[in-house]
Amino acid sequence: HHNTDAFGDTAPQDICISSTYWMMGPAWLCTHFWTHYEYTGDREFLKKIFPVMLEAALFYLDFLVEKDGVLVMCPSVSPENTYRLPNGQQGAVSYGVTMDNQILRDLFSQCIKAGEILEGTDFSAHLKEMEVMENCGEFIDKIVDACGKLSPTQIGSDGRIKEWMEEYEECEPGHRHISHLYGLYPSRQISVDKTPELAEAAKKTLETRLRLGGGHTGWSRAWIINFYARLHDGESAYHNIELMLEQSTYSNLFDRHPPFQIDGNFGVVSGIAEMLLQSDEESVRLLPALPGAWKNGSVKGLRIAGGGSVSMEWKDGHLDRCVIEAGNPMKRVIRYGDTADEIMLASGKTEWNPVLC
């Protein structure tokens, strides 16, 4: 729930239906557990938090219902946003909202991966506490089945990512929330390399939202920087950094919502890192969204998925030197511009030069 507190208060908090009935907080928080494991490879940590992930999955498995051959959350809302019905009435509650599907796809797929990594570990006591009758493998099979039945991210007739299952008219077309692009960032479900059609639709979604007044809060502007970084659009990402500093930053450098919200500060730092380096379990992309304003520069110790870090130097807008320090041996495709070089990274430092590919 969006407002669960230390005292166990999980009741709807107020009359703002479009936020009060958002129930994806636990699933999103669980993805942070996985991200920590993904970047550290800490198996003991994964073993410790896996039961939490399973319990979150259990809740959503119980909550999902079938609609037109797919599993959907119902009731469901797109956080703080509303739509207009054909009769002119304003609505918020729906079913199978895009953000819900994307978050659940992350949670379920991460539970599946964690189950594979921890295969053979006994979680029977935890499952018994959860009142799950199956063994861990059988329960994971249920998650696999449900994950395959989630509605995919859809493109509307106007070429944008659909926010709701239905193509509703938006009450506020320039809304600060762009929740249906969760799949672009922080998730990796939408990418320029693997899902170009969805990436193009995400770009159009973003451009339309901004043209109509979006990005007017600091945290929203920070999210937009990350979106453009994932779209490999360094100039747009940099432009939004400028807007962030000009319009959404106090003199003490606190993010301006208004008032102060620290997620804007964290988000812009994340966006800058994403402009310089992006990675997943298969590849490492160097300088994916380098703007012209950063003609020369260097960065040290940016973390990569799988455990390790990257340090780089660039001159005149081109990569000059790259050192990858892997925490353990792993195969990765190193991407820079149009270059894609599959290499086996040994533990320790590896110097990579695109000229030698």
Language-model region placement:
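Active-site core of glycosidic bond-cleaving carbohydrate-active enzymes
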Residues: 4-39, 43, 47, 98-283, ...
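Aromatic- and acidic-residue-enriched carbohydrate-binding clefts of CAZyme catalytic domains
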Residues: 2-15, 81-93
